[in-house]
Amino acid sequence: MIADGLKYGYNSITFDSSLGFRVDWHGAGNLGTASFPITEFSWKACSKDHSISAPSNLQVFAICIKKKIAVGTVTVAITKTDSNQTPHPEAVALVKPGFALVGGGAEVHWNEWGNFLWKLEPSTSQAQSFSAASKDVIYPDPSIITAYALGIRIDE
């Protein structure tokens, strides 16, 4: 499942289940500001231009699993953590105990010029977590970032 969007320099797409995005821009540029779960069954991705109007396409990619599978029922847990407001915010969301990390995302709560995602990364350590970071570029725009961890477990 792929959804495409175009909206005068600021893109926002919401649809059921997803785990990735790509901003296809030309000219001045358009960068990602969000890719995160809204509910256990829906995802949102956003991008924006930076000081110069730069319309672009935003593609959001879906990877899905059925709720009922042969070995049981898939239960989803979404956890989130907010950063402090800063020019280069970072946050780490921990997976709920008893769940396996399957993905994550982030939403930047930017103010005027924008603060853009540069890091969406699952943990490589024993602590199951998902890290996110963003930064302002050229023009100061201290922002808050919310990191999300998406976990699942199979219940019989």
Which functions belong to the PLM regions below?
Residues M1-E156:
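Extracellular attachment/recognition segments
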